[in-house]
Amino acid sequence: MQIDRIKYTMKHRKAFRAVEKQLLGHNTIRGYLHDLDKVFLYMIMDYKRAHKIHRNHSRHHTLKARTHADYVQMVIDWECARLTKPDKQMNARETLDKLYPELKDKVLPVIEELGL
């Protein structure tokens, strides 16, 4: 079991909910469930495998995002990453510009809608 990764993920989940509430005015069911799968995956498998499964199946990641709600969750995730992840200090707009410019047509309107 990867206790440090579980603690890290729990801290990120808390930050996600705080940013979600700040931006949307409320928390969503998806916000409460955000990255919860990782907590359980870290209990039964190594980091690389858990990370791969999570990214391939979670709709708030670029491989699976399809709906407006998916992109809202993605932007919130990008925006809150800098609060708990020392290695990810960009905000949502910077993340879009530097890492995912191919998503600009879908994600930039969401960033602007959220006032970021």
Please identify what each model-predicted range represents:
Residues 1-116:
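Metal-dependent phosphohydrolase cores
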